[in-house]
Amino acid sequence: MADSKHQVIFCNDSPKRVLVSVIKTTPIKPRTTADSLMPTSPGFSDFMVYPWRWGENAHNVTLGPGSGSGAASPTRTSSSPAEADPLSCPEHLKDGIRRGRPRADTVRELINEGENSTSRIRCNICNRVFPREKSLQAHKRTHTGERPYLCDYPDCGKAFVQSGQLKTHQRLHTGEKPFVCSEKACGSRFTHANRHCAKHPYARLKREEPTGGPGKSQGADNKAVAEWLTKYWQTREQRSPVPGKAKPQNKSPLEDQEQQDPLDFLPSDEGEEEEQEEEKNAPSGGVVTARRRLQEQRERLHGALALIELANNLSA
């Protein structure tokens, strides 16, 4: 054909002509009803790679047609573009599967979901819904500009919306780096739990409180800073659990898990506040590893229970 030539684009800043490439336009094949009924495999993402994240994405999985009586296998049906896009799925946005602030491209979906949701925990300004009242109160501060958590470090004066943000910020003053690379003989320490070791990017970070007391800021020359650090570490010691004393547990972890709401295991939208409270009280050594493995088992079990519930709802 005479029209199938190389496309030439003129640059605004230069008179030179740049040869780009041959652009082939292929008509989009319309999706038929038979294609929409065929089960398809879910995308290759973190959901498929990491089993401990099954609980986060279990409500995104649907069962293909005809699999209710047979062997149930998790599939995604793409009967419509709205269902193919996970961000437009109401279930994906129902309880918030990510901690902290949402991505900029998901805010509009959250607002639209709030307009059609029956949840009573709703922001009266932007109609966004939340899984719990505490999350709503923290969210409203983004509209009012309220920052009730003030850093009392001398000459700092920074304020934060959530208490967890204040605790993370104060590590910059104290020099704390409680998160250590789990790789043996690495020794890389970090201030935040969401960092990754450059040498071992796939290794997880574990919480490890320093045993030597205050860090590099201990010998501060400023008297006010020294007093603040002393008060800070005294408060930390009072909150830290006494070694050798554990809270009595009348129930096993599995029994306690079965009686809790399965949605409690999903990450909430409350930032890092609750997560840091648990990490602060966590012991060190092998107990941390055992607790992490137990949490992974809980999330795997939650993912399996969610799939079973979806299968029951589909068959009903």
Curated annotation (Swiss-Prot):
Biased composition (Acidic residues): 255-278
Coiled coil start-end: 289-313
Keywords: Activator, Coiled coil, DNA-binding, Metal-binding, Nucleus, Repeat, Transcription, Transcription regulation, Zinc, Zinc-finger
Chain segments carrying region Disordered: 61-97, 234-294
GO molecular-function term, one example from the UniProt record: zinc ion binding
Top-level taxon: Eukaryota
One annotated GO biological process: regulation of transcription by RNA polymerase II
Pfam families for the chain: zf-C2H2 (PF00096), zf-C2H2_6 (PF13912)
Gene Ontology terms: cellular component: nucleus
Protein family per UniProt: Belongs to the krueppel C2H2-type zinc-finger protein family.
Functional summary from the UniProt entry: Transcriptional activator.
PANTHER family reported in the protein's UniProt record: TRANSCRIPTIONAL REPRESSOR PROTEIN YY (PTHR14003), ZINC FINGER PROTEIN 367 (PTHR14003:SF26)
Protein name as annotated: Zinc finger protein 367
